[in-house]
């Protein structure tokens, strides 16, 4: 079966024990590793967590494939590595970037990666690395990331993610997550593509606890979609690239690694439409903490402290009375990397545009720019809708170090601090 078919089917749910077969009877019944698997397939286990994790935390999937993954020659380190591999010295300064320019030369997803910031080497079971991707051609090779799971946030152009477990098609305002070690290929459906990636080195992403919100709200499990089995039975030479401790290594295969005919388990790629997010907000006064906008979280061993939170700022009604409605001025223990998929962000009147990004590190003061602040103080507080917008945030408890490439790109705004420079004191001790 070829993965180029446009008709894609999905399975609904988050964290489910899924199962799928592209040929009838390809899944063994009642056991995982029979002496002879159906259709002459090989059984292979992909573990996303340690064997002895609590059952509620365990992630693993059984694959029934044409050729075992173990059949490959030695990997060799590629001469061309990911841009931004070298991190710069930590900086407390606030940083903001214009959209990165799309490539002029033929560039696939891998060649178009730029690491923007990171807070941990890949040999640590925690932390996050943040990238932007820029591409103008589909991959003719396959890739897997041994360093972490990948959260993809498209900003421009639709992608088809052809994975070992099947295909996902994602567009701007949708996201996709690829498990650590899952082989995949990125195909471009619109000629050019740009977007953001969080590489999660820590615990796998999961839905946040809802607490007093109750049993419904935010991102609902049924809106997450996993693929169905689709396989390639190809004997053409193909390059397989892996990312290992931050470096790219490759080997040449004599077959397609996307040859899984059937599978079952819960360590799966998935997609989610951000437009399905059930936004929670105040119906009385004050601006709630932005944690109410959390889509996915990777926890740490400290309860309530995230390795990374993925947070969105979607279209929503603003109805708070006697309230400064934009996100307030803030100094945060957490480190915030923001991007904009479409529209405008309500705390920035200008300078933060779709495809751009910003980084506010631990305790770096930030908040609405002067123009947004003045408008909010003088606003008529009638209910109004913030529409046609989608900003997001990768928030992590560990300090992010920008890469040298991110600091040297012409897209870096050297005048970012100026957006707060015209804030003036309005204090008057004689007038309350």
Curated annotation (Swiss-Prot):
Key words of the record: Dioxygenase, Iron, Metal-binding, Oxidoreductase, Phenylalanine catabolism, Tyrosine catabolism
Fetch the Pfam families from UniProt. HgmA_C (PF04209), HgmA_N (PF20510)
Residues holding homogentisate: 345, 366
Pathway(s) per entry: Amino-acid degradation; L-phenylalanine degradation; acetoacetate and fumarate from L-phenylalanine: step 4/6
Q: State the InterPro entries in the record.
A: HgmA_C (IPR046451), HgmA_N (IPR046452), Homogentis_dOase (IPR005708), Homogentis_dOase_bac (IPR022950), RmlC-like_jellyroll (IPR014710), RmlC_Cupin_sf (IPR011051)
Q: What is its EC number?
A: 1.13.11.5
Q: Which GO terms describe its cellular component?
A: cytoplasm
Catalytic site positions? 287
Q: Which GO terms describe its biological process?
A: L-phenylalanine catabolic process; tyrosine catabolic process
State if Ribonucleoprotein is listed as a keyword.
Answer: no
Output the HAMAP family linked to this UniProt entry.
Homogentis_dioxygen
What NCBIfam families does the entry give? hmgA
Q: What does this protein do?
A: Involved in the catabolism of homogentisate (2,5-dihydroxyphenylacetate or 2,5-OH-PhAc), a central intermediate in the degradation of phenylalanine and tyrosine. Catalyzes the oxidative ring cleavage of the aromatic ring of homogentisate to yield maleylacetoacetate.
Q: What is this protein called?
A: Homogentisate 1,2-dioxygenase
What's the encoding gene here? hmgA
